[in-house]
Amino acid sequence: MSKALLKFVRLSPTKARLIARQIQGMNAELAIASLEFTPNKAARVLSKVVASAVANGSLDAKSALIVSCRVDAGPVLRRSIPRAKGRATAIRKPTSHVFVEVAEGKEMKSSKSHKKNQAEGK
């Protein structure tokens, strides 16, 4: 089992968790391929962290499974923007800590059509 951790990424944790939930339990190679075509900053970051976790354990991406994929909230950078009448309002720039754990395995996440065929006995 190998791990990779990327801290203080300028990325909203709520937006990154949407992508992280999709790849949990997937084959690492399949996850990297699907993240490559996801038009999202979080997908690019998660793809690199998954690849790093696979490399850290000297595993083959075809046989590696994503055991856990977690996105925790980091510190929030606070900035201000000038407004009318001499005022200023706050801007929050959230950061995240991305944690991916990969283990050796053979199973792949089943697609809906595969599950449907199994239920029908095909």
From Swiss-Prot:
Pfam families, A to Z: Ribosomal_L22
GO term, biological process aspect, one: translation
Designated gene of the protein: rplV
Quaternary structure note: Part of the 50S ribosomal subunit.
Official protein name in the record: Large ribosomal subunit protein uL22
Function, as annotated: This protein binds specifically to 23S rRNA; its binding is stimulated by other ribosomal proteins, e.g. L4, L17, and L20. It is important during the early stages of 50S assembly. It makes multiple contacts with different domains of the 23S rRNA in the assembled 50S subunit and ribosome. The globular domain of the protein is located near the polypeptide exit tunnel on the outside of the subunit, while an extended beta-hairpin is found that lines the wall of the exit tunnel in the center of the 70S ribosome.
Gene3D superfamilies tied to this protein: Ribosomal protein L22/L17
Family the entry assigns: Belongs to the universal ribosomal protein uL22 family.
InterPro entries reported in the protein's UniProt record: Ribosomal_uL22 (IPR001063), Ribosomal_uL22_bac/chlpt-type (IPR005727), Ribosomal_uL22_bac/org-type (IPR047867), Ribosomal_uL22_CS (IPR018260), Ribosomal_uL22_sf (IPR036394)
